[in-house]
């Protein structure tokens, strides 16, 4: 029983705190003010103030669903809030359901058709058919080829090693002799077989189509799979294995998928960290070469992390502790030139700008999916400052050196300038569509990016040089702009006819652009078909003069069990007075969730979940 004077102290403490945010007294453990008032206690005597997470949408979604479910239990709510699948749960939300959340006032038949196309897009992007072709009809012994063929492929491998400047610049003499004489079974390190057959496939794939070429590619494919059938390639770090993973991921595009490419590059990054980059026991030359490779991998790592919404392999603090190669260093490492390649100065400036933008890409990733979600505007300003400077430098270098080049070299420089703009616009679109405050600014950059595709698509298919992005960047980056514009068209067909016309013209460029990339990968051809039909359905909605009528209840779209469509192709709609303001708030809330990573029991929801110790020596 509490003494009278003790009760008076409790009452005084609670009265003193009336109107304050914290409802409990720090003086006494006997305060029951929160309980008596029926409010949640926000004070913890362990020293932690418990506040509701600002962007924790999971609990809100669970609460909303609980209102419509009579058999929801506390355990069910707990499982849903933590991302664990409930027993007997059936995740059958379709793309049409998601579109209806965004555009509830639209019931046009084309909306249902577009929803089915989004399901088809998801299946295409996440498909593994390309990689499954690589493992088809495996063999137990290597096919052998004539000596002229093998020497041609070896010469190309030497040229690529010299051009890429990874870790090893030439083929070891004993490996060269074994491969030239068609004795692959005698090569001890399978990494060289993976590099050799990857380059051989790349060389043969660029030749004209004929029966002999098809048979040769089939044998090379099976040889590559047999060479890759060595677990040491993935678990035992070595310079040759890192190099093999990079060449496999970037040169055998025909048999790659976005996820497989990400896995290979991530493994290469992990192995490089395991070997050490700036370890004190390494000599200067080795540290310099590994630092160069770090910056090369950092570009690929951050690009794939943004494409697939995965955590980067390299922590962003590493870029501040590993010295960026200087322009003089980049110029010195450029190998001997032929007349078809641009001088070293332009390429050095371009690579330097790519190293700089890889740091900004890390900031973009953290602004979208990490801990810096409140710094979107700040990251956007840094991105714009980088682009202003990069454009001046690249244009000046091109102005000086382009007149000295052949037509092929000049075309390569033009591609570099276009790719720089392409990289910048893709990041601007990602930042603006992910921020509620900046979402209205996404339409202009989206239109500009899609209009850029006409010229860019003519230069990409036949070019494999220092100014080219990963194929997956060329396929993926325009999709965010595409989703922003067709969503704008579907939501506001009559709000601004002139703007709708510009958006329609812009989205029409994407199918044509993807068609030009169809020769490089079957995924491009499939995406071209899907986006062309989305454009047609959007055009039907724009051209429709009658008010849309409610659709009757129909069967669910095909493939209802597929994962939710990739966020990039879903519509992004900027708030506008022409829309019902009572509907825009749920729209913004829904779109905000598109840029939050799914709950993962290993990584959690952010990348910076561990403390970075600053030790790169591994």
Swiss-Prot record:
DNA-binding region: 14-41
Molecular function GO labels: DNA binding; DNA-binding transcription factor activity; metal ion binding
Domain of life: Eukaryota
Record field: compositional bias (Polar residues): 59-81
Location in or out of the cell: Nucleus
Annotated keywords: DNA-binding, Metal-binding, Nucleus, Transcription, Transcription regulation
InterPro entries in UniProt: AtrR-like (IPR050987)
A GO cellular component annotation in the UniProt record: nucleus
Predominant subcellular localization, coarse grouping: nucleus
Disordered: annotated segments: 52-87
Function noted in UniProt: Transcriptional regulator; part of the ergochrome gene cluster responsible for the typical purple-black color of the ergot sclerotia. The ergochrome gene cluster produces several ergot pigments including the yellow ergochrome secalonic acid and its derivatives, as well as the red anthraquinones endocrocin and clavorubin.
Protein name: Transcriptional regulator CPUR_05421
């Amino acid at each position: 029983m509490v003494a009278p004077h003790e009760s008076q102290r409790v009452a005084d403490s609670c009265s003193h705190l009336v109107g304050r945010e914290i409802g409990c007294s720090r003086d006494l453990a006997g305060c029951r003010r929160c309980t008596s008032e029926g409010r949640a206690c926000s004070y913890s005597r362990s020293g932690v103030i418990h506040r509701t997470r600002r962007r924790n949408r999971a609990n809100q979604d669970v609460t909303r669903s609980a209102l419509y479910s009579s058999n929801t239990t506390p355990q069910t709510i707990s499982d849903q809030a933590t991302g664990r699948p409930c027993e007997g749960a059936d995740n059958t939300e379709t793309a049409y359901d998601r579109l209806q959340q965004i555009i509830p006032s639209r019931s046009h038949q084309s909306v249902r058709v577009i929803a089915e196309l989004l399901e088809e897009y998801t299946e295409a992007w996440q498909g593994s058919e390309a990689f499954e072709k690589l493992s088809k009809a495996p063999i137990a012994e290597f096919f052998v080829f004539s000596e002229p063929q093998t020497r041609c492929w070896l010469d190309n491998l030497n040229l690529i090693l010299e051009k890429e400047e990874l870790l090893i610049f030439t083929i070891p003499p004993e490996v060269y002799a074994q491969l030239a004489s068609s004795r692959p079974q005698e090569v001890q390190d399978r990494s060289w077989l993976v590099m050799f057959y990857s380059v051989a496939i790349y060389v043969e794939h660029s030749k004209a189509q004929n029966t002999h070429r098809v048979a040769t590619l089939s044998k090379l494919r099976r040889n590559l799979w047999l060479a890759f059938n060595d677990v040491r390639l993935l678990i035992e770090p070595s310079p040759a294995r890192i190099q093999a993973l990079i060449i496999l991921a970037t040169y055998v595009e025909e048999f790659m998928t976005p996820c497989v490419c990400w896995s290979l590059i991530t493994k290469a990054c992990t192995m490089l960290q395991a070997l050490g980059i700036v370890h004190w026991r390494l000599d200067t030359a080795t540290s310099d070469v590994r630092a160069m490779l770090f910056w090369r991998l950092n570009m690929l790592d951050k690009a794939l992390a943004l494409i697939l919404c995965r955590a980067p392999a390299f922590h962003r603090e590493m870029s501040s502790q590993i010295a960026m190669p200087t322009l003089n260093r980049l110029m010195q490492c450029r190998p001997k030139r032929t007349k078809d390649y641009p001088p070293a100065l332009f390429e050095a400036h371009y690579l330097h700008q790519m190293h700089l933008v890889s740091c900004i890409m890390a900031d973009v990733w953290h602004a979208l999916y990490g801990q810096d979600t409140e710094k979107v505007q700040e990251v956007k300003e840094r991105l714009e400052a980088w682009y202003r400077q990069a454009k001046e430098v690249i244009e000046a270098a091109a102005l000086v050196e382009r007149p000295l080049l052949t037509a092929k070299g000049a075309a390569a420089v033009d591609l570099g300038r276009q790719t720089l703009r392409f990289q910048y616009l893709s990041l601007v679109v990602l930042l603006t569509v992910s921020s509620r405050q900046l979402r209205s600014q996404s339409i202009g950059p989206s239109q500009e990016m899609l209009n850029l595709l006409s010229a860019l698509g003519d230069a990409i298919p036949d070019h494999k040089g220092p100014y080219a992005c990963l194929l997956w960047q060329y396929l993926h980056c325009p999709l965010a702009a595409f989703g922003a514009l067709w969503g704008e068209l579907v939501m506001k067909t009559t709000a601004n006819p002139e703007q709708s016309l510009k958006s329609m013209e812009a989205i029409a460029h994407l199918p044509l652009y993807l068609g030009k990339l169809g020769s490089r990968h079957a995924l491009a051809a499939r995406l071209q078909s899907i986006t062309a039909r989305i454009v047609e359905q959007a055009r039907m909605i724009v051209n429709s003069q009658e008010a849309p009528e409610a659709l009757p209840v129909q069967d669910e779209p095909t493939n209802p069990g597929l994962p939710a469509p990739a966020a990039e192709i879903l519509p992004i709609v900027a708030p506008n007075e022409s829309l019902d303001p009572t509907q825009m708030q749920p729209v913004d809330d829904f779109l905000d969730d598109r840029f939050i990573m799914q709950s993962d029991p290993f990584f959690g929801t952010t990348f910076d979940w561990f403390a970075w110790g600053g030790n790169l020596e591994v």
